[in-house]
Amino acid sequence: CIANRNGCQPDGSQGNCCSGYCHKEPGWVAGYCR
């Protein structure tokens, strides 16, 4: 899984966050796990 503060996509296309939550705001190309 993806560690906190590492890059992610909410749709899971880059893998799943260890925390289960990918934070991505409007306009961002990618989000980050937290």
UniProtKB/Swiss-Prot annotation:
The presence of a 'disulfide through disulfide knot' structurally defines this protein as a knottin. It is found in: Secreted. Has antifungal activity against C.glabrata. Coiled coil: none annotated. Keywords: Antimicrobial, Disulfide bond, Fungicide, Knottin, Secreted. Disulfide bonds join 1-18, 8-22, 17-33. Belongs to the AMP family. GO terms for cellular component: extracellular region. This is Antimicrobial peptide Alo-2. SUPFAM superfamilies: Gurmarin-like (SSF57048). One of its GO terms (biological process) is defense response to fungus. The keyword Secreted applies. Its main location: secreted. The keyword Ribosomal protein does not apply.
